[in-house]
């Protein structure tokens, strides 16, 4: 049975086509701020238990859509699935975040790196994509909203692979980049090939848009960012499938702290650039001059404010962009685990309400 999208507003906005309102989804929209997520995680036993079992991943992917009229679903997974598939031994210690048992530090470590067999090592992800697509679709073949697939960027993956986990200053990975750029470029080359293959596998399984999360690109200096992050994002984008089943598959790139390099990101070949909250959205729209759509960019901590303040800040973001195509509303980074769910409901409602008013010319 042929599938049709009931709500394709998100995809049309990414392609800079006119929409009746501004679509919204939220980074980490399926997460610890939702009681139902925590209940499912408890059943799964761990974060990796959630991410590596398609039934659980499907369940938590759909949870925010049951609460809020969001305009897209995003695959529940983790950005570190690729290095885990490379054999680095990913674990999430309680209260400590991700850790790798086998960090990549030496020439011998780098020499052992290889692009994983996506089907053999990451089949649980593509299985989840297929299962989520089925769950989003009713008996008549009508799909509620599009599904987003994603990966970490080559540089961001390298940060975790070399540091062995998170870091405050990234001194180990940066030291390698400056002292042994040959090793760093070898890691990044393998990562770029793996990210492209991984995203293409998600597209073939049913992801209708894909996003590259360059969470730590902003830790680099100007110049180093272009060499070690941007160039490899460009390589990934060049290898992506941009059509599947007769439909365009838009690509989004997001560098946290990357406002300085907006024009560079817009020139990578992506359809949209994600922005954090430090960037003026109206000026960003002028800077990209219609070449790409923009996604963002409310400060996530605003969701701790009273409802009327949340609504006012949402209106400010929408007013900054103005009545132009090509905007997807999002946070400037992932939603905090401490966010009250009822505040998310206020945000989603105001984005839909006020953007419709802007389109109609009333704007209030």
Swiss-Prot record:
SUPFAM superfamilies: UROD/MetE-like
Residues at the site labelled Transition state stabilizer: 78
GO molecular function, one term: uroporphyrinogen decarboxylase activity
Binding site for substrate: 28-32, 78, 160, 215, 333
Gene Ontology CC annotations of this record: cytosol
EC numbers: 4.1.1.37
GO biological process, one term: protoporphyrinogen IX biosynthetic process from glutamate
Cellular localisation: Cytoplasm
CDD domains in the record: URO-D
Primary location: cytoplasm
InterPro entries the record matches: UROD/MetE-like_sf, Uroporphyrinogen_deCO2ase_HemE, Uroporphyrinogen_deCOase
Keyword Cytoplasm part of the UniProt annotation: yes
Pathway: Porphyrin-containing compound metabolism; protoporphyrin-IX biosynthesis; coproporphyrinogen-III from 5-aminolevulinate: step 4/4
Family affiliation: Belongs to the uroporphyrinogen decarboxylase family.
Protein name: Uroporphyrinogen decarboxylase
Species of origin: Burkholderia thailandensis (strain ATCC 700388 / DSM 13276 / CCUG 48851 / CIP 106301 / E264)
Gene: hemE
């Amino acid at each position: 049975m042929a599938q049709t999208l009931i709500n394709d507003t998100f995809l049309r906005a990414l392609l800079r086509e006119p929409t009746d309102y501004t679509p919204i989804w939220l980074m980490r929209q399926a997460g610890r701020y939702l009681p139902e997520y925590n209940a499912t995680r408890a059943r799964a036993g761990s974060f990796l238990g959630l991410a590596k079992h398609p039934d659980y991943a499907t369940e938590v992917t759909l949870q925010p859509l049951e609460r809020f009229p969001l305009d897209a679903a995003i695959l529940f997974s983790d950005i570190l699935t690729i290095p885990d598939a490379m054999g680095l031994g990913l674990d999430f210690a309680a209260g400590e975040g991700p850790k790798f048992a086998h960090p990549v530090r030496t020439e011998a470590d780098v020499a052992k790196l290889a692009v994983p067999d996506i089907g053999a090592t990451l089949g649980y992800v593509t299985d989840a994509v297929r299962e989520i697509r089925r769950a989003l679709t009713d008996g008549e073949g009508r799909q509620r909203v599009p599904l987003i697939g994603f990966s970490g960027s080559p540089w961001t993956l390298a940060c975790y692979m070399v540091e062995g986990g998170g870091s405050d200053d990234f001194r180990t990975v940066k030291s390698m980049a400056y002292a042994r750029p040959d090793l760093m470029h070898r890691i990044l080359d393998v990562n770029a090939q793996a990210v492209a293959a991984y995203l293409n596998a998600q597209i073939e399984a049913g992801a209708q848009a894909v996003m590259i999360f360059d969470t730590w690109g902003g830790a680099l200096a100007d110049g180093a960012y272009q060499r070690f992050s941007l160039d490899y994002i460009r390589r990934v984008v060049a290898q992506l499938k941009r059509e599947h089943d007769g439909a365009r598959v838009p690509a989004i790139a997001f560098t946290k702290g990357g406002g300085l390099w907006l024009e560079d990101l817009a020139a990578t070949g992506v359809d949209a650039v994600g922005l954090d909250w430090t960037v003026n959205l109206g000026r960003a729209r002028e800077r990209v001059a219609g070449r790409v759509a923009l996604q963002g960019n409310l400060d996530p901590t605003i969701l701790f404010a009273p409802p009327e303040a949340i609504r006012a800040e949402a209106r400010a973001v929408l007013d900054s962009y103005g009545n132009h195509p090509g905007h997807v509303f999002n946070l400037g980074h992932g939603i905090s685990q401490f966010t009250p769910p009822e505040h998310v409901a206020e945000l989603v409602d105001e984005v839909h309400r006020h953007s419709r008013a802007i389109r109609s010319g009333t704007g209030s």
